[in-house]
């Protein structure tokens, strides 16, 4: 490890590859709440947070693990579940009195049509005003999971083990979305 007066150790969360402080400062300067979208292969999480003196304050949050309460039987790490998680977080934020936000994608790459932007699209459809470019949002057919259903129909054996049939994903998506909308009217 380098030593001496000219060597500067990066901040701990930057060394752990967890925080981009330059991006965080730009988002905080906007003065708007942040829609923090974090995705993994298994789950999706969305939170609306504002900076506070003792750390960020969370006003509304949703996880794809909660979608089971609304009847979601499909896996929770795909694009349709990311949209539904964003919609659920956006609906909770609107219920909490928030009406605008900026998207915080963290260290994720801004690839058009990915799950992070599906979270944003869900929050926008729930009633939040988030500045965005429509080119980064996925097609509605992809958001509903029609690409997953088409792939499942090509297979000889079921795509997922268990009771859920992936070929029915678009209809299942519509049913769960309607349930969430009824719950947050």
UniProtKB/Swiss-Prot annotation:
HAMAP family recorded: Ribosomal_uL18_A
Family: Belongs to the universal ribosomal protein uL18 family.
Gene: rpl18
A GO cellular component annotation in the UniProt record: cytosolic large ribosomal subunit
Pfam families (alphabetical): Ribosomal_L5e (PF17144)
Role description: This is one of the proteins that bind and probably mediate the attachment of the 5S RNA into the large ribosomal subunit, where it forms part of the central protuberance.
Biological process terms in GO annotation: ribosomal large subunit assembly; translation
GO molecular function terms attached to this record: 5S rRNA binding; structural constituent of ribosome
Protein name from the UniProt record: Large ribosomal subunit protein uL18
Oligomeric and partner information: Part of the 50S ribosomal subunit. Contacts the 5S and 23S rRNAs.
